[in-house]
Amino acid sequence: MIPGEIFYGSGDIEMNAAALSRLQMRIINAGDRPVQVGSHVHLPQANRALSFDRATAHGYRLDIPAATAVRFEPGIPQIVGLVPLGGRREVPGLTLNPPGRLDR
C-alpha cells in the first residue's frame, strides 16, 4: 500500500438503500426568486414559497446525496424523490414551530 492510496469497492452504491419507503412529489416554487433545499432538511419546513403537499411530506427529506441541494426556479414544477428522515427522527426545527419527534 502507498501512503494516501485509496481502495475502492467494486459494484454500484445504492443511495439511501435503507429507506423503508419512498415518495415522489411535485413541487413548484410560487415565489419570485430561486429556492434551494438541502439534503437533510425536513421538507415540510422548507421555504413557504414552495407549493406542495406538506402534510404528506411530514417526516421526509429529499432523496439526494448528502451535502447537496435541489434548486427550485420560480414557476417551474419539479418531480422529486423523498425518503424518510432517519436516526432518532427528531427535528429541532428551522422555524418557530419545530415538529420535534416525528413518530409520536
From Swiss-Prot:
SUPFAM superfamilies assigned: Urease, beta-subunit
E.C. number(s) listed in UniProt: 3.5.1.5
Pathway the protein acts in: Nitrogen metabolism; urea degradation; CO(2) and NH(3) from urea (urease route): step 1/1
Comment on pH dependence: Optimum pH is 7.2.
Keywords: Cytoplasm, Hydrolase
HAMAP family, sorted: Urease_beta (MF_01954)
Family: Belongs to the urease beta subunit family.
Protein name: Urease subunit beta
Organism: Mycobacterium tuberculosis (strain ATCC 25618 / H37Rv)
